[in-house]
Amino acid sequence: MSKTIVLTVGHNVGNNPMFKTSEICDYAADYLGVEAFTASQCFGMWQGEREDSTRIEMCALSDDEAEAIRARVPLLAQVLGQQAIMCEIRPDHVEFIERETVAAIKQA
């Protein structure tokens, strides 16, 4: 079964803003072992303090792939100096639908 994995990563280390969304994405690509994801900047609260954050959404096409990503999250947290990274793993139906050529569409 496929899964959707959503990470929410704060930009602060302690009370100091340290990262931008683009930097969080670079680290995520390097440390999570994924080749595709969608990211958006947001803000949230951590221990009662407002903090800019990045949400990263990924698709895992199997339970094993989802677990492999989840298992790398503590390393990402360590590299970014985070106490924790919120990780949501939800069952989902994900498929990648490839484009058709114009000729194939006209014949249909």
Model-derived regions: residue spans:
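Positively charged, small/polar-rich N-terminal and surface patches that mediate targeting and assembly
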Residues: 1-108
